[in-house]
């Protein structure tokens, strides 16, 4: 992908921001990888939207959930859920299925950065609009989500926060139009092409250097 956000990722970020702003009950999911890489960035996004963050771990232990929840609060998280789950997502193993009413369980739009395909599919099967952040446009997560941002999480989340702030000034009808015009399949195809082009450029540059020119 290179060191910059691609045109396809920019399209997805705009659509994701519009979707989050249109949502009645949006929520942000934080797993262990997301907490390690982008806790501060996720807190900033939650703050811009004034919505909860919910801790959900693949390998859940009460101690790990508590540590991540505390980290998010230290970074300024106002609403952090996940320590006392009171519902479960159908179709997932018990620990993975745990969710919180008022958070992910009741959400109509959920952002799930760096998540696996099973969780993405299970949330989508509940009728939720799922926004993924995934470096692989061919992954099950990227394909099953409503919007997939194919970018590094450290670029994607701040860019999403910035778009939320920018688009929040627009009338609702403009946001609806943005979401309607977003073509998920087309954007994923574009992401694959961008990765291919980037790899070919790299290969040509390396071949050029190796030839001594």
Predicted stretch roles:
Residues 1-8, 29:
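Acidic/glycine-enriched edge-of-secondary-structure segments
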Residues 44-96:
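Long, charge-dense
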Residues 86-105, 111-118:
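Active-site glycine-rich loop that binds ribose-phosphate moieties when present
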Residues 140-213:
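C-terminal functional extensions of proteins
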């Amino acid at each position: 992908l290179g060191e910059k956000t691609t045109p396809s990722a920019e399209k997805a970020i705009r659509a994701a921001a519009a979707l989050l702003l249109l949502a009645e009950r949006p929520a942000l999911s934080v797993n262990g990888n997301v907490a390690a890489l982008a806790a501060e960035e996720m807190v900033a996004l939650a703050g811009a939207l004034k919505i909860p963050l919910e801790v959900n771990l693949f390998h859940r232990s009460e101690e790990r959930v508590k540590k991540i929840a505390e980290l998010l609060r230290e970074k300024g998280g106002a609403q952090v859920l996940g320590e006392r789950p009171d519902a479960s997502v159908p179709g997932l193993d018990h620990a993975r299925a745990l969710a919180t009413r008022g958070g992910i369980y009741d959400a109509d739009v959920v952002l799930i950065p760096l998540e696996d395909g099973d969780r993405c599919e299970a949330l989508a099967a509940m009728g939720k609009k799922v926004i993924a952040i995934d470096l692989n446009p061919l992954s099950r997560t990227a394909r099953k989500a409503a919007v997939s941002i194919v970018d590094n999480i450290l670029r994607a989340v701040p860019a999403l926060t910035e778009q939320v702030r920018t688009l929040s000034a627009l009338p609702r009808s403009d946001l609806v139009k943005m979401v309607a015009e977003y073509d998920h399949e087309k954007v994923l195809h574009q992401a694959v092409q961008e990765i291919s082009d980037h790899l070919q450029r790299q290969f040509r540059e390396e071949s050029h250097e190796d030839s001594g020119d």
